[in-house]
Amino acid sequence: MRHTFTLTNGVEIPAVGFGTYKAADNTDEAIISEAIRQGYRHLDTAAFYFNEEAVGKAVRESGIPREEFFLTSKVWKDQLGYDSTLQEFENSCKRLGTDYLDLYLIHWPRPSDLNAEWRDLDVETWKALEDLYKSKKVRAIGVSNFLPHHLNNLLERTSITPMVNQLEFHPGYIQKAAVDFCKQMGIQIEAWSPIGRARVLKEPFLMELAEKYQVSVAQICIRFALQCGVLPLPKSSSSERMHQNMDVFGFDIEENDMYQLMTLPQIGWSGEHPDRERVRF
């Protein structure tokens, strides 16, 4: 059975994607090829990941038709603006070896935490994405790491509502205000870092749930995202864990357990925030 989420424009996305950021040093292509062998068809990359060529090569060498894949890329924050975004889109397509993308995102809403012109830059960048979408070069457009005030800037000044917003989301860091806002606007949330960091994997309640449901802690995290209506983008360099991370449709987390997961104290935050310099732990 094929599990998908459906965007507001009717485009379907495989319900679990494969995150490719820092998959492993110098072995991106092998890892992505293995992910494809394990059944992943939704691959998430970005110009900043410096692995679009590896993703494209793995897709081509898989022997699976391009249209069976869902490819996402993103414009980096130092290339915001109308003309530079159009050029960056073409560069990403060239590196990926494709003439279209399934989803293209603005990676971050601000070039830096000190940049005061981000509102106008975001609007110019979004208008470039709108034109790419209207010209059918991309099947869906969206943003990443946008909070409600960043989104409102676009909603008030442009014509197409973002279809996707990628956010850090995992037990212990669910960004409820941003997620609720996106749901109200019909914006699909995708979760980067859906498994969180080491502290999440060692959280006693999550370990207790893993034993209760006879799955891994990572599977609990991924299933939690899905039951919240969030599309997870786990990453792994292990074939076994790749398989486990896809094997999350044979159980449901009970309601009371979901409530406890949603109200965990903050753990595992990456330190990344769109309006602040990164917090180092």
Specify the residue positions occupied by each region the protein language model found.
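Beta/alpha (TIM)-barrel catalytic core signal, keyed to glycine-rich beta->alpha loops juxtaposed to Asp/Glu
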Residues: 109-281
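CE4/NodB-like, metal-dependent polysaccharide N-deacetylase domain
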Residues: 85-106, 131-135
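Residues at the N-termini of beta-strands
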Residues: 42, 100-103, 140, 164
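A short, structured active-site edge motif that brings together acidic residues
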Residues: 66-79, 103-109, 166-169
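N-terminal binding-site loop/beta-alpha segment at the start of enzyme catalytic domains
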Residues: 1-69, 196, 281
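Short, acidic/polar
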Residues: 24-35, 81-96, 149-151, 174
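Acidic-and-aromatic substrate-binding clefts and catalytic sites of carbohydrate-active enzymes
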Residues: 23-26, 44-54, 78-83, 112, ...
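Acidic (Asp/Glu)-rich catalytic clusters
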Residues: 8, 56-66, 93-98, 155-158, ...
